[in-house]
Amino acid sequence: FHGHTKDSKKNIKK
């Protein structure tokens, strides 16, 4: 998951 946002921390596996 290449997105340095708050969502990237909860969706780090995707």
From Swiss-Prot:
Sample GO molecular function, one term: rRNA binding
Signal peptide, first to last residue: none
Swiss-Prot/TrEMBL keywords: Ribonucleoprotein, Ribosomal protein, RNA-binding, rRNA-binding
Assigned GO CC terms: ribonucleoprotein complex; ribosome
Family of the protein in this entry: Belongs to the universal ribosomal protein uS19 family.
Biological role stated in the UniProt entry: Protein S19 forms a complex with S13 that binds strongly to the 16S ribosomal RNA.
Annotated protein name in UniProt: Small ribosomal subunit protein uS19
Source organism (scientific name): Pigeon pea witches'-broom phytoplasma
Lineage: Bacteria, Bacillati, Mycoplasmatota, Mollicutes, Acholeplasmatales
